[in-house]
């Protein structure tokens, strides 16, 4: 009895192994398809590692190498404006993969943002007070999901004037730098300038030269009133002048300004 049961179990196991062996084999020219990714897009279905004749071998870094060979598009400063009101306005679009909302700055009655966008077409939308809306006054496009977005086309030709002005500014700055860095004209030699002793130890004057022009020492014109003095220089104001002592009398003078008039006061003091 025990031997019969053992043989039956052994036979069932052997049959299962044979069935698995038959199921694991493939007919000539037949392969199972393996679906990878989303089933919404039939283009993502792929076969196992089967290579057709003439296929190229790609190394893992070849895609990065191809991307590095492509020239990078220059970013252009683009003004985005929202004029439909609101308290808080943000913007998001295909230029940042709709990942973040960029705030707009309020300027008078509008909201403005200056974004550095690469050349080409970009879709964008505004987030105003918690709702996604588009600007009806700007070009629009319907996305693949059926939503209406604004469309902007950044072209290089729109910035040719700014590029020309920038190039002209750079050239003018380089020219001015060359002019400043150039040496003054004239002969050059190897001899060092030697200071003379009187130049080295020259001391400043006791009295500044412009204070030597005292209006009381000047002669008065005959055609002028002798009580009127010529208009003094501004450096002569608020200084005290003294006349040489004669006949035991000292004379002091000072000139002051009151609005548009000048008053010279003389003080006589006996000694």
From Swiss-Prot:
The modification Phosphoserine is found at residues 38, 68, 94, 107, 157, 169, 173, 183. Keywords: Fatty acid biosynthesis, Fatty acid metabolism, Lipid biosynthesis, Lipid metabolism, Phosphoprotein. Phosphorylated when associated with the catalytic subunit (PRKAA1 or PRKAA2). Phosphorylated by ULK1 and ULK2; leading to negatively regulate AMPK activity and suggesting the existence of a regulatory feedback loop between ULK1, ULK2 and AMPK. GO terms for biological process: cellular response to nutrient levels; fatty acid biosynthetic process; positive regulation of cold-induced thermogenesis. Gene3D superfamilies: 6.20.250.60, Immunoglobulins (2.60.40.10). SUPFAM superfamilies: AMPKBI-like (SSF160219), E set domains (SSF81296). Residues 1-46 are annotated as: Disordered. One of its GO terms (cellular component) is nucleotide-activated protein kinase complex. The modification Phosphothreonine is found at residues 39, 147. The keyword Iron-sulfur does not apply. GO terms for molecular function: AMP-activated protein kinase activity. Pfam families: AMPK1_CBM, AMPKBI. The keyword Lipid metabolism applies. Non-catalytic subunit of AMP-activated protein kinase (AMPK), an energy sensor protein kinase that plays a key role in regulating cellular energy metabolism. In response to reduction of intracellular ATP levels, AMPK activates energy-producing pathways and inhibits energy-consuming processes: inhibits protein, carbohydrate and lipid biosynthesis, as well as cell growth and proliferation. AMPK acts via direct phosphorylation of metabolic enzymes, and by longer-term effects via phosphorylation of transcription regulators. AMPK is a heterotrimer of an alpha catalytic subunit (PRKAA1 or PRKAA2), a beta (PRKAB1 or PRKAB2) and a gamma non-catalytic subunits (PRKAG1, PRKAG2 or PRKAG3). PANTHER family: 5'-AMP-ACTIVATED PROTEIN KINASE , BETA SUBUNIT (PTHR10343), 5'-AMP-ACTIVATED PROTEIN KINASE SUBUNIT BETA-2 (PTHR10343:SF92). Belongs to the 5'-AMP-activated protein kinase beta subunit family. This is 5'-AMP-activated protein kinase subunit beta-2. It comes from Mus musculus. The gene is Prkab2.
